[in-house]
């Protein structure tokens, strides 16, 4: 199963490819890409997209990675974070674990509004379990 067309095409040739989602550091994109290219070579291939964040142009990335285990994946993510990238890890269960790192009351409020019984994607939003703390 894949989330994007780049990973789909790579996995159609070799099932050992996976991907990450990240926002590259503003004004430091090439340093990160060049560092990873030097350290990881062809184990990390780039799919870049231009996005707007609060009116400023940014580069988002969906790099495809040759899967060599969780330790190597974590090392690649740490390399990216050290150089200022924001990682949205698709290899975890919860929204909070994927990138935010904290419970977002606005997301809990939205889930309460659109899924008041919590039937959709149970366990995906960690904040759902502590929704009473938000007085909503």
Q: What are these regions, as identified by a protein language model?
A:
Residues 1-136:
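Conserved glycine-rich FAD pyrophosphate-binding loop
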């Amino acid at each position: 199963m894949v989330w994007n067309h780049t990973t789909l095409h790579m996995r159609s040739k070799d099932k050992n490819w996976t991907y990450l989602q990240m926002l590259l550091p503003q004004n430091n994109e090439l340093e990160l890409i060049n560092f990873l290219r030097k350290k990881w070579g062809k184990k990390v291939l780039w799919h870049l997209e231009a996005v707007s964040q609060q009116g400023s142009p940014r580069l988002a990335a969906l790099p495809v990675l040759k899967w060599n285990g969780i330790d190597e994946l974590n090392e690649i993510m740490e390399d990216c974070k050290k150089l200022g990238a924001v990682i949205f890890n698709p290899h975890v269960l919860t929204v909070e674990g994927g990138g935010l790192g904290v419970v977002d009351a606005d997301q809990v409020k939205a889930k309460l509004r659109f899924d008041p019984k919590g039937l959709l994607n149970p366990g995906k939003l960690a904040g759902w379990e502590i929704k009473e703390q938000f007085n909503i």
